[in-house]
Amino acid sequence: MIARAAGEALVQEGERIVAARGPLAVGEAVVTTAGRLPFKGVIHAVGPQQGIGREEERLVQALGAAFLRAHERGFESVSFPAVSSGIFAVPLEVCARAYVRAVREFMRAHPDTSLKTLRLVLVDGPLVALVRQELGRKA
């Protein structure tokens, strides 16, 4: 969906990155052009699949890498989908903990970051409820 909206420039840049360095590993993130999208860039992060082990840690790592790439580029805001909760089948409870943990850990480690807004874009009602519950817990 993002690639279609962004256009061929994003796809071609992604192909160049993979040709130069190989596919991203779980926990890694890179930035490409946003193409036709009205953004400074698109961050590509690889989250874990259920069953590979340490899913929560690896998801926190992937999101942290994405936030770091945004910080390095001076982005002021970033929106991210429910990474690993769909076809990668990581349980929603694990995803909710990881999303909240990743944001808290990144903000603690980078209090001077240019990032002012971190948006989690959720379309799944149960996941929204779980993230709200996690946000209510003490860090």
Summary of predicted features, one role per range:
Residues 1-72:
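Glycine-/small-residue-enriched capping loops at alpha/beta junctions
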